[in-house]
Amino acid sequence: LDEKKVPKEFFISKGTLDKWIYLKGPKRADRVTKTGHKYKYSEGPVTFPDALDRASRTIVTGEGGSGASRFKHVVETKSGKLRRLTPVELERLNMFPDNHTKEATDTKRAFFMGNALVVGVVQKLSKSLLKQL
């Protein structure tokens, strides 16, 4: 979407940027279970911001809301600002028509897209399966 058409609440504030960077970054920590078992927790980095010249990561149900998250998609605008994806962009990634979920709140719309299947892929699979019947 054109940056000018994106509501301001989708932009990441400088005050929360450090949290986003931490959550998207690699982590390694010693942990202990309730039963006393010690283990190493680790997770690799997530591309931040998301690359626009590659396939998108999976949309998850926690995509909505303004809070920082390891799993939410973040893109860099032409002017260098960082922002979350809008509901329409999430719909487009899943090949739904624009505003397919417009009756719901933005958070619920993102949740719906996190639970959705990519429509075009399902259509192609079904056509292929029907030919084999």
Range-by-range predicted roles:
Residues 1-133:
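C-terminal target-recognition/interaction regions appended to catalytic cores
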